[in-house]
Amino acid sequence: MSISLYDHQRSALEKMKNGCILCGGVGSGKSRTALAYYYLQQGGNLDIPDAPMKNPLDIYIITTARKRDTCEWEDELAPFLLSTHEDCNYYKNKVVIDSWNNTAKYKDVKNSFFIFDEQRVVGYGAWTKAFLKIAKENKWILLSATPGDTWQDYIPVFIANGFYRNKTDFIDQHVVYDWRSKYPKVDRYLNTGRLIRLRNRILVTMEFERHTTSHHQDVPVSYNIPLYKDISRNRWNPWEDRPIETASELCMNWRRVVNSDESRSVAVLEIMAVSYTHLRAHETEADL
């Protein structure tokens, strides 16, 4: 078992705790970091190769339907020797990956660990009610790229962390509605200093800078050398059957000779075939 983490992921791990929101952009590795947190909480050790967990809790991952159906989380689970398939799961605990639409199915689960991916617990609908019931009886963390646009978006997470008894308690302490509006519209928030402190207690931001690695490969190909030389010598455009009038037109004809040669297309197809073979091999290994 090899579990490797980047520095920004290890830094986030040091700040994470039950009930936190792990905030990071696309490509920051939120999923890997969340599973590493679970691994550590269940007795694992990132500094000791092959260090097993000790009687890990059942883990439930609530994510988008797309991520569930494309098995993205299955790939993330593999380095931790976890799988939704019982015969592939080293620890034999229950591993469930499901979508937010089915959150209510798990509202009676207790003494387990939940990862809520792509946070959807805003407002006060069915998802939020199920989330609050789950949060009372289980360990949990949230993953999000955009944790909240307004203070009201944080109400469910604040309640789940025990900062407020319920939505009414939050509103009584912090919300002033616009009395001129025909529908409930927030005019302003009170005591925002406390709200900022509470948000900072649960928000773990991943300081991540994406670095693109360029890969260059030189592939020698042939071209029609006699035609290239004829154009150079005679200054004649063979495609339009007329004299070449300018230096830029001469360069364009040279490029056309080189770029339109069949050998270039063959080379591109060969590169694509090799890349596809490597991709299929990687997918096959992931399925084993």
Describe every region a protein language model picked out.
Residues 1-20:
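Conserved pre-motif I regulatory segment
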Residues 19-35:
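Walker A/P-loop
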Residues 31-52:
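Walker A/P-loop NTP-binding motif
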Residues 56-58, 113, 130-212:
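Conserved P-loop NTPase motor "coupling/switch" region that bridges the ATPase
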Residues 56-77:
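Conserved Walker A/P-loop ATP-binding site and its immediately adjacent core
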Residues 110-130:
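SF2 helicase catalytic motif II
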Residues 261-276:
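Conserved interdomain hinge at the start of the Helicase C-terminal
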Residues 277-284:
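Conserved small/polar residues in nucleotide/adenosyl-binding loops
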